[in-house]
Every structure is written in structure tokens, then in C-alpha cells.
């Protein structure tokens, strides 16, 4: 019942402000799936719609024919960083000047890419990784990067196995990254 109320509230907020805020919903997804219960059909459909919108936007980032390299996260337009410390020339890594986003925003965005599959936390010697595997794809969110000094990245999302990105980027790489400063 609480999840339904949060969904209605998020939908109402979207209609009024034209800004989608799924942060409360992400918390319920994690809670419901941890409790061993599945999501209701309505909730699963809602989450799948958010996933489609955000994944479509993500795929466009790697499309070399798209002139706009910005990304919209929770109503905030985040500019891509080009040049030194920015996105790489090959096109597999995009860096964003995302200082306006907090850790929860970035985590929730990564969760939206994974849909109803909750991100699982793993700690290692380098830091923390949250990951989700679905439909032959993997979404990793990590708080470390080997290029952190150059890119100034706080968080990196790895997108592994997304054939749509391969198609639009004309690259055969299996792993693409978006980095958040």
C-alpha cells in the first residue's frame, strides 16, 4: 500500500512539475525485493517504463549522430565534459559535470537503469560496487576509477552487454562507462 501511495505521489509530482523523482520508489523496490516479495504488476510496469526512458536516453549518449551530449537526471540537465579529463575520443566513456547530483541521485539513477532488479552491494579493496544483472546485461555503480585523477569522477556506472549501445556507437566494445564528477 505504501508503495502504491509513493507511486501516485511521484506520478502527481511528474504531472505538476514535469520532473520525475523516483527516489522514494527506489527505496521501496529494494525493501520489497529484500523481503522476498515480488513487485505488483502495476509497480513493475511503472518501474519498467522508467527503465525504458532512462535506458533510451543513455543509448542516445553513445550515438555519434546525436548532437546533444547532455543527460537529464531527475529534471536536472547535466552537461558532458569534453576535452582534458572528459569523455574519451573512442566514445566508450562519457564524463559529466554532475556536481549538482548527490550520491543518492546517482545511486537511484543506476537503479532506474536496472529496473526492478535491485542493486547488490559488494565491497572490495578499491571501494564499493553496486551491481545488477538482467537480460544478459550488467549495470555496475562504483565509487572508484583508475582514471579518477584525470576525470575527477566520484562515481562510475559501467554498462556491460547493451547491444543497443553497440549498434548506435558502431563499436564492438562490450563495456561503456558514464562517470559523474
Regions picked out by a protein language model, each given a short descriptive name:
Residues 117-180:
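Functional cores of ribonucleases/endoribonucleases
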Amino acid at each position: 500500500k505504501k508503495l502504491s501511495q509513493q507511486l501516485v505521489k511521484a506520478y502527481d509530482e511528474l504531472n505538476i512539475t514535469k520532473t520525475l523523482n523516483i527516489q522514494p520508489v527506489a527505496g521501496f523496490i529494494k525493501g520489497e525485493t529484500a523481503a522476498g516479495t515480488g513487485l505488483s504488476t502495476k509497480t513493475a510496469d511503472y518501474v519498467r517504463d522508467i527503465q525504458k526512458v532512462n535506458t533510451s536516453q543513455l543509448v542516445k549518449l553513445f550515438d555519434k549522430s546525436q548532437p546533444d551530449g547532455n543527460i537529464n537526471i531527475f529534471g536536472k540537465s547535466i552537461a558532458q565534459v569534453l576535452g582534458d579529463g572528459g569523455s574519451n575520443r573512442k566514445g566508450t566513456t562519457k564524463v559529466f559535470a554532475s556536481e549538482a547530483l548527490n550520491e543518492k541521485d546517482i545511486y537511484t539513477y543506476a537503479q532506474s537503469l536496472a529496473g526492478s532488479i535491485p542493486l547488490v552491494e559488494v565491497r572490495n579493496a578499491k571501494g564499493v560496487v553496486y551491481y545488477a544483472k538482467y537480460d544478459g546485461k550488467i549495470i555496475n555503480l562504483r565509487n572508484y576509477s583508475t582514471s579518477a585523477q584525470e576525470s575527477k569522477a566520484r562515481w562510475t556506472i559501467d554498462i556491460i552487454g547493451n547491444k543497443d549501445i553497440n549498434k548506435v556507437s558502431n563499436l564492438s566494445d562490450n563495456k561503456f562507462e558514464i562517470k559523474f564528477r
